[in-house]
Amino acid sequence: IKFEVHSGLGDFVSCDEMEFYQKNPDKKLDAQLLGVFTDITCTEVRDEATDAQINALPGYFANIAIQLKRNTYDEWEKSFRIQDYHPYSNVEEWAETLMTKRYSNLDNPTGIYVEAGDSVIVLVGDTHGQSLSIQCIGEEKSGDYVQTAASGETRFLEEGVNKLGFTQRGMLFLMYNTNLQDVNAKPVKIHIPLGSGYVSGFFDVKTDKTNDKYKELINKATYKYFCIRGERIMFYFHRDKMMQAVPYDILSAINLWDNIISWQQELMGIDDVRPSQVNNHLFAISPEGSYMWASDYRIGFVYTYLNNILLYDNVMAAKDNAWGPAHEIGHIHQRAINWPGSTESSNNLFSNYILFKLGKYCSRGSELSALAKARFVDKQAWWNMGSATHQNEDTEIHMRMNWQLWNYYHRCGYKTDFWQKLFKLLREDRIVESNPGAGQLHFAKMASKAANENLTEFFRMWGFLEPVNNVEIEQYGKWNYNVTPTIIAEAVSYMSQFPAPK
């Protein structure tokens, strides 16, 4: 048997234990079930099914049939135990295509959790030839605190009856990731029957719709974490903290954060593929330590801070309440426009855009007088501009450069799709992370191309055209910074083909 592993969490793969099972060719149970139920998911009893046929079933399935026939299957439980699960895109593929960190692949919550050692029955309908699995998401230790795990035990599913065992406590998520343009990327009906796992529920803004429904669902929930699925983000936060921060108006919170992510995606120019080809959510968790962070598959907001970042009025009460989360989500989206030495500022293009869209606070970043001092008094270039404040970078002065481009082209109206074009150009012709000096000049060239204007003097002012001779910088790793006279001349020559700015 040969295994080829093409992706893994954090680009690492390890195997602790692998088990093999023989596929059961015996379909007698399936045939018996289909004599009583209308399909293999066992969600509806045939009109002609007799009590004798029902009683002849294994006890577990007989109980399901009796509950359905007598209409005693609890409607709240049924709404989570019987679901049509929709397909979602492949996060690894689209992270590479769109130059982002990986979004989540936990797009399909079941609302059902298991305890360690539990076995569950999962009844799977027509899979249309697609590959499906169930993943059990529990907790992990991070230093001296716990947080939601990035991944967990995974069990593959086949059409028909599946009996699965789990060794850890956790919430079950249905994994259904495929090419959305495949004609067979269709919803799959799945039934996790009574007696298999414990229903805690979740709130889906598309189907549940109202604050009253949210209040009902979160009050009924029994698991430590409660899931809110919006259009673009999922909250998977401590239930008790959610009830304190958002006792009722969940629509204020989820609509705000769906908008914030939508605005960031708007800058990236990806409306040609989202949501038709890529539809994954960001997945926000509430660690019991640290502060805020962003990584592949999830973003974290410490559980003691949820009150500040959820309800619209609370977010608007202080500039940093919007800035911090927008900054972290910006890390998810910055890769195309980033090179080492700019990692804690290029994402703030998104943060400043969110402040603009919210309409209450002015932008952040140093005044242009700080740029003048850095260039003409301190004789600094881009790579060492200002005074390092975070990760060996003066983020306040650096972030002003991207925002000046936005102000000129978007706010002043000279080219209102400038950033969208620049993102697309840099996805097609990419900055090489290992060569930050060449990366900054490549950014300048593509910015001129996106604007269709010669931006030589703009980037000269920002210190891009100053020679740098093999300087080692440190920012999330060590990098050699080289900006040679040769590549400066080549960049100036390239930009000169475009007309002067208006």
Model-derived segments and spans:
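A mature extracytoplasmic/lumenal domain signature
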Residues: 7, 19, 126, 178, ...
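Aromatic, loop-rich ligand-recognition surfaces of beta-strand-rich domains
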Residues: 1-30
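Residues that flank catalytic or metal-binding motifs in active/ligand-binding sites
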Residues: 11-16, 118, 130, 170, ...
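Beta/coil-rich, acidic/histidine-enriched accessory regions frequently appended to metallopeptidases
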Residues: 29-74, 436-502
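Active-site-proximal alpha-helical
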Residues: 374-481
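Low-complexity, Pro/Ser/Thr- and charge-rich linker/hinge segments at domain boundaries
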Residues: 23-32, 191-227
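Catalytic cores of extracellular degradative/oxidative enzymes
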Residues: 214-410, 416-425
